[in-house]
Amino acid sequence: QIIKMLSLSRFPQNLLVSRCFSSCCSWPGLSQWRNAPINSNRLWGDTSPQYQSLPSLPNDHPGYVKLLRASSLSELGAIALSTGFHPAPPPSRPEKPVLVSPKDIPSPKECGIPLNAYMLHNLAHVELNAIDLAWDTVVRFSKLHDAIGEGFFEDFARVADDESRHFAWCSQRLGELGYSYGDMPAHNVLWRECEKSSDDVAARLAVIPLVQEARGLDAGPRLVRKLVGFGDSRTSKIVAQIADEEVPHVAVGVHWFVAICEKTGCAPSSTFHALLKQHQVVPKGPFNFAARDEAGIPRDWYENEDSVNAHQLAPVRERLSDIISLEMENAT
């Protein structure tokens, strides 16, 4: 019954085993992250996050609805985790940014936006999508509440809360640089990846936390170095903090993916590879092995000979990429 509910019954039978599970190392900080109070450090101070109280507004104030949308729904207690409603695809979006194909995203020079603001805008777009992805996971799979357990939904509500702070920091810093979210076009790739896994909770975990969010572990340090090279240490500190806080999001994905595999008698490693093949998703390096190891993703889930070679060449490629980016900016 559970296999049918989780849409795992279509897996090849040779993936169904009793206890042949890949060895996964849980992130040591997972319990502390779960038990911590809601983080209200939504303002970026001189060098680190700072507490920001929510303003008190009357219900008829024009900013009230905006406040509710921007704030943590888990903090406001505005969602029932056992709801049976389905989220309406796609989620609501502001008029800007205009969504275009990835190949049509303009360069910093074409946008007339400096490189640091350009990269920060891209990150803000990722964080906004991450909020929607987390809440979509909570609502879309709420029908499995009894089978999975309430902890699953509490974890992803907390992920959404984290992502809302990250978006707030990015938006604040964009404003300090003289820009705002929506000042350049963006793509809709992340939401399309979400739609691929809309009918299968195991696929959702494989595609989103274990591939898409794991890419943030890989890209974060590279982005920090580029910003430092550009001379924007303030933005680099924001990005470094965001990258650190992505580790528990990936760790949550690992935990629940393995838990669901255990419930259904599936080998996590084989199931992960089968799901990625089914949904035509390919993990792309170079990988940040240290951060991925910390989050608990077994290397055999994503590593192959090509990725090992890419990892060895990564420092050279990253340095060249940094030099090219800075030269392009100087040329403008």
Q: Model features per residue range: what roles?
A:
Residues 1-4:
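Short, Lys/Arg-enriched N-terminal segments with co-localized hydrophobic residues
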Residues 6-332:
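Non-heme di-metal
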